């Protein structure tokens, strides 16, 4: 009985902790949205447009009042919208921890550093690829789409075909990686990418040092737990399998290989960028495939397993 009582107490404490965290995250989400609305209302000179762009940016949803997305607004307003997307692609738990650790703790966060580094590095790479190929999109477009793809926001300043084929491949990778765990961004998530990089690093070092070498599996100085590793590997396998299957379906319907890969990666990463294939006239089968990818990309593997495995329903 004592043991059962302890379990009940632990469960109650855990539930209360989840409730407290949820309230804090909700309050932070509302606060970020209100600040974003105020900033964008001034930038646009229109409170309604500011609100619509703020809601889409904080949610990294990418919906815009204008059919031109960010193409029809000023450079300053577009930069502010993308900046808000970056803020929302960072874990909300990290923003909450900043109250205790200060800005130094935020700057030291490895996921934040990786997010900013990927946006800057990919933007520069795409710009160089544009210059090399002579394609239509400029430097500003390269960085704007890099941020939009990495945060899975889906805002655009030019059509996707304005980028060279290698540039589109870079955007595909970014959409699949996505933002931070605990943020509004989709994708595989940065922390899981760091886990896989740590695994590859250990494998490489073990080859160099010999099979008897004892090499700890660590991420940012902290040991990677078995469950964390299994989570990352399992999700990577599921995402790769789903992406390949969906891509083959698109190819069977006559869609060009790169465009098919772009559309399926965008759906799986819940990014919303398009290569021009998706529209009102899209075949119902392809619409269903993209819908399934977006659902899988948003709820992720373990929520799907809970849904499809009856044994988990009673737990």
What are these regions (language model features)?
Residues 1-315:
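Membrane-proximal intracellular helices of multi-pass ion channels
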